[in-house]
Amino acid sequence: MKYPKKVDSLPMWTRQLRNEGYDLAYFYGGDADFTGMRSFLVTGGFDRITSDQDFPLKYKLSKWGVPDQYVFDATLRALQTQRKTPFLYVVQTSSSHEPYDVPYHKLKDERLNAFAYTDDCLGRFIDQLKRLPAWKNTLVVLVPDHLGAYPKDIDYFDFSRYHIPMIWVGGAVKSPARCEAYGSQIDIAATLLSQMRLSYRSYRFSKDMLNDQVRHFGYFSFPNAFGFVDAEDSVMYNCDNHQVVADQGRRRGYNLPYGKAFLQKLYDDLGKR
């Protein structure tokens, strides 16, 4: 997000949906200009961005801005007046982020209390969304951007730090199912577009997690290190000292060259933009 010229050249599935006639809106209780976020969203096709500036001052109750309940309320109001065009609405929560100052007091542990608050807000939102006519054709995708900081003090080189869920709910989901495929946020683009029968050829690093014919793996990175995991091997590599710092599975070491190659391809792609 900090390199607008490079971002401008990226293929973006949100922009693709806008070109397909989708109505795009983004809802966030914090500062939409934080780290170039607004520029990134506009480039991605979002022409309506709701942020802390769009809420009454009395709702700005936390360090991050407006608590989640008011953000979900704003989203619901927008959905209630939404025209019959296809839409993509994105809600970014923030109340479960430290310092955990939320208008909710049910658990003694402030961290768990904040998690419970966001969970309660989301549950209420889904319950209200089910009452709208649009529910029967709506897909809600729930996914975090990073670990939730619980249990406390998880080491950077602990695989559990990067194990996050992705949950699909909504009237558009035909039946309950559990997907065991390995993947990462990179794969959301191809997976969703495939379900919508839209091309995802432009997203060279993304793969359809529901396609049994492709190799499923998860890639993640953090400053000066990367991880590459699948059902056979999970490896983490420290690029500073050129050492494997974690490796587990039936085929230890198997994914190291794949992880290195993936990282190199990412840098090559970034350098050309």
Give the ranges of each region predicted by the language model.
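Solvent-exposed soluble domains appended to multi-pass membrane proteins
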Residues: 1-273
